[in-house]
């Protein structure tokens, strides 16, 4: 991977760990949100000297630390019931934190403030630690947590740092070596949604000003990963599930995760933390009585330090049992590759011009506001530019668009060649339907809420006859809107045979 500085790193490669920011000796790097709401490094070229330190420290560019066990020991853990009640899973994080506090140490974890911003901070006692409990399904803003960790270590303090595997890798790269007083715990990670998506969800669903608390997970209605809870200032509660809550649905279906999450080298073995922690999903498949419905933590001891810490807290838990690693892997993500949702790009595009709720619904259902018919696929610049303008105008009106591909034709066709300029442009800037035969066009009624026929000679009989009567929208249901925009016959008269002209006139009445 060859980059001049960290600002040249592709978005598919950057984890957003911020190690580069605090490693730069000239303060030339800041983390800024992009259009999707994820944070990426931005380099001030006037301050940058090209020293290359940001490249050397980057967990994406550098090799993965392979020193931990490729097949770590796996454990199922229950904290005491009162701890599990207030935890997302088995309460092991609280057990660890109490151990560190008892040694005069500090805990670094993620909290959500009263503005529902999610970020890393430091807790020096159990009261400050309480907000760190519970899952937060948003990529946390690391702020200045790495320098703070370094500062506490410099004072001889024990530090417990929890974060996603890539964040742990970033911290270790920033520190530059093994720290005896540092205990790192990487979390089992499905992937990270953006701050922007969560903010839009909160504002649209509840109104931030009305909300008192939000919990990404709750056990009030059973132990699962798909139930969230919002508590309003007036005392009312909202419970959301995968069936109807847009954030839960989009997160579990990987609709709005960071691009790097799709191929994360830190999700696989060996892990980056001294310990790995998360829910032991699928534990019932191994041993049913290890799931009592109150939460079970999966803990991996990735090295000798992690194993020693786990041994030291055994007397502080209600139950701990060694399990086969295969049981841990079966229902959890322990691999680099993950299939992100095919509509991810479209979701973030829609987020710019419509509600988060609608963007999730239409992307999950494969629906569009408008299906655009016409000759956009023609091999000329004017045609593709005109249809691009039409689609952008509709998007500014808050409408999602689907370009309906060339109907009916089967066989060799240069307009279908992926190497021609119109196809290259379309693949980059449009969402294009699959090819439909003429007798299949009616299926588009299940996908598009309305239809538009675009400009150019779409009603020129010499052109349109190649597509049956599809450019007259013969396949569109009566109740759906049918609109023509700058459609043309190309001549001052129609060249259809009389019988076809009469039939066409009936179709025109439906517009």
Question: Where are the language model's segments positioned?
Answer:
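Flanking helices and flexible, charged tails adjoining ferredoxin-like Fe-S electron-transfer domains
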Residues: 1-4, 10, 46-155, 323-357
């Amino acid at each position: 991977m060859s980059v001049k500085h960290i600002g040249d790193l592709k978005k598919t490669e950057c984890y957003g760990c911020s190690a580069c920011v605090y490693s730069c000796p000239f303060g030339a790097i800041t983390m800024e949100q992009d259009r999707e709401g994820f944070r990426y490094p931005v380099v001030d070229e006037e301050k940058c000297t090209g020293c290359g330190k940001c490249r050397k420290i980057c967990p994406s560019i550098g090799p993965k630390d392979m020193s931990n066990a490729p097949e770590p020991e796996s454990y199922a853990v229950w904290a005491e019931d009162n701890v599990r009640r207030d935890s997302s899973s088995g309460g092991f994080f609280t057990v660890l934190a109490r151990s560190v506090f008892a040694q005069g140490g500090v805990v670094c974890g993620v909290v959500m403030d009263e503005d529902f911003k999610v970020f890393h901070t430091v807790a020096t006692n159990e009261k400050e630690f309480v907000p760190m409990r519970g899952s937060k399904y948003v990529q946390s803003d690391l702020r200045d947590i790495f320098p703070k960790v370094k500062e506490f270590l410099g004072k001889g303090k024990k530090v417990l740092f929890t974060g996603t595997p890539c964040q742990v890798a970033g911290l270790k790269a920033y520190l530059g070596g093994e720290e005896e007083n540092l205990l790192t715990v990487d979390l089992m990670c499905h992937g990270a949604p953006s701050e922007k998506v969560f903010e839009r969800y909160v504002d649209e669903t509840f109104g931030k000003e009305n909300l008192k608390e939000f919990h990404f997970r709750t056990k009030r209605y059973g132990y699962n990963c798909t139930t969230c809870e919002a508590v309003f200032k007036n005392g009312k509660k909202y419970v959301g599930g995968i069936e109807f809550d847009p954030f839960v649905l989009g997160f579990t279906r990987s609709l709005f995760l960071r691009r790097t999450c799709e191929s994360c080298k830190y999700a696989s073995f060996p892990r980056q933390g001294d310990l790995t922690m998360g829910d032991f999903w699928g534990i019932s498949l191994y041993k049913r009585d290890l799931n009592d419905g109150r939460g079970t933590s999966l803990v991996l001891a990735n090295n000798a330090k992690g194993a020693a810490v786990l041994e030291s807290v055994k007397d502080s838990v209600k139950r701990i049992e060694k399990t086969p690693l295969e049981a841990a892997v079966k229902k959890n993500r322990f691999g680099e590759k993950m299939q992100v949702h095919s509509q991810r790009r479209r979701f973030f595009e829609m987020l710019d011009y419509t509600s988060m709720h609608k963007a999730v619904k239409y992307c999950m259902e494969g629906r569009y506001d408008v299906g655009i018919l016409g000759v956009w696929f023609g091999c000329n610049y004017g045609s593709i530019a005109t249809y691009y303008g039409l689609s952008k105008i509709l998007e500014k009106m808050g409408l999602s668009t689907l370009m309906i591909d060339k109907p009916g034709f089967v066989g060799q066709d240069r307009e279908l060649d992926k190497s021609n300029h119109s196809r290259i442009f379309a693949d980059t800037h449009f969402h294009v339907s699959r090819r439909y035969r003429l007798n299949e066009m009616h299926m588009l009624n299940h996908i598009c809420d309305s239809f538009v026929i675009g400009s150019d000679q779409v009603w020129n009989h010499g052109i349109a006859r190649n597509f049956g009567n599809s450019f007259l929208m013969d396949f569109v249901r009566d109740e759906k809107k049918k609109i023509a925009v700058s459609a043309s016959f190309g001549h001052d008269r129609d060249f259809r045979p009389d019988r076809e002209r009469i039939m066409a006139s009936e179709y025109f009445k439906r517009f």
